[in-house]
Amino acid sequence: LGKYFRLNNLKVTGYYDVNENLAKEAATFTETTFIEDLETIVKISDTLFLTVPDDLITTVWNQMKDMSLEGKFICHCSGALSAGDAFPGIDKCGAFGYSVHPLFAVSDKYNSYKELSHAYFVIEGDEKHREEIAGIFNNLGNEVRYIAAKDKVKYHCAAAVCSNHVVALIQ
């Protein structure tokens, strides 16, 4: 997403990862900044995308939740996990949680961004600022759909099955 955002003139603050080499690699690839610690990237960003494996989203959230998050948008890209499940207690922090899932198979972190302009993005989360999150992708020319938290697992299952059938047909 970072490369896609940068190529479309959206500001990307930078990258943080517990593995500094991965964050430096992402920052170099996107021509942004390597951020040395989680607290700094949270402080200087208004919207944060936690692009970590699904089973680590809540772990990262738990490291962030006691920081100053008032008014910030916290997003993850899981197809199955709802924003509420990923970010328990986010409303108490004054922040807003979103699941922003591209209906798109990311097979190569260095090249998949080239096709993201054709992806649908499915958004679930706090209704208060949902239109602002959707606007990011609408302004890039992407189609956006909203989904209820209760439908996330069914949606993810359908997406995975369809994707696997297409791959099987191609092979």
Tell me the role of every PLM-derived stretch.
Residues K3, K24, T58-T59, G84, ...:
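Alpha-helical elements of the RecA-like P-loop NTPase motor core of helicases
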Residues F34, L38-S112:
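Rossmann-like NAD(P)(H) cofactor-binding subdomain of soluble oxidoreductases
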Residues R6, K24-T28, K65, D91, ...:
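Class I S-adenosyl-L-methionine
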Residues T30-T33, D91-G94, E115-S117, S163-N164:
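Short, hinge-like loop/turn segments at secondary-structure boundaries
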Residues L1-E36:
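NAD(P)+-binding Rossmann beta1-loop-alpha1 motif at the extreme N-terminus of oxidoreductases
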Residues T13-D17, I74-C77, F121-E124:
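Short, hydrophobic beta-strand segments that form beta-sheet elements in well-ordered domains
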Residues L22-A26, S112-Y155, C162-Q171:
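Internal alpha-helical scaffold of NAD(P)-dependent oxidoreductase catalytic cores
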Residues N8-N9, F29-E31, E70, K92-C93, ...:
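Short, structured coil segments at secondary-structure junctions
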